[in-house]
């Protein structure tokens, strides 16, 4: 799984993480161990590490989330549709941010089973 970006993040349940990232989001399953699972997402490598520590839920999208930059509107819409079809937990519903400015973009935030935020 060649990757251009690698991100490691904590999860409380590897089985739930695999179901969310592979079966629902469509990531490619990579290496697995008893403490971590590797996923491929659009050429990037995500590594879910099992954490015994309680994972604090964030109070907002900052300072910690990870996002996928999609260059075509239809890619974004397909992912939003997939998330809605699977009844994923939206931290923020699909919407347009900063309308009429040079940084205008479409966005939504999902929350994985461990409370990690994905844009």
Predicted regions and their residues:
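N-terminal beta-strand motif that seeds the catalytic metal site of vicinal oxygen chelate
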Residues: 1-15, 66
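A generic structural signal for short beta-strands and their flanking turns/coil linkers
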Residues: 5, 35, 44, 62-64, ...
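Conserved beta-strand in the GNAT
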Residues: 47-49, 119
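Short glycine-enriched loop/turn motifs at secondary-structure junctions
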Residues: 1-3, 59-63, 101-102
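Acetyl-CoA-dependent GNAT
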Residues: 51-53, 97
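Core segments of cupin and vicinal oxygen chelate
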Residues: 9-47
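Short, charge-rich, low-complexity interaction segments located
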Residues: 48, 55-59
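Vicinal oxygen chelate
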Residues: 14-15, 67-117
């Amino acid at each position: 799984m060649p990757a251009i970006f690698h991100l490691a993040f904590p999860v409380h349940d590897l089985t739930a993480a695999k179901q969310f990232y592979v079966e629902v989001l469509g990531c490619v399953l990579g290496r697995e161990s008893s403490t971590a699972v590797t996923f491929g997402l659009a050429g990037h490598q995500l590594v879910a590490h099992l954490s015994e520590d309680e994972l604090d839920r964030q109070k907002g999208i900052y300072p910690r989330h990870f996002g996928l930059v999609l260059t075509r509107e239809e890619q974004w819409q397909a992912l939003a549709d997939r998330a809605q079809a699977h009844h994923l937990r939206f931290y923020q519903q699909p919407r347009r941010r900063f309308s009429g400015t040079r940084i205008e973009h479409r966005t939504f935030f999902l929350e994985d089973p461990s409370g990690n935020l994905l844009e």
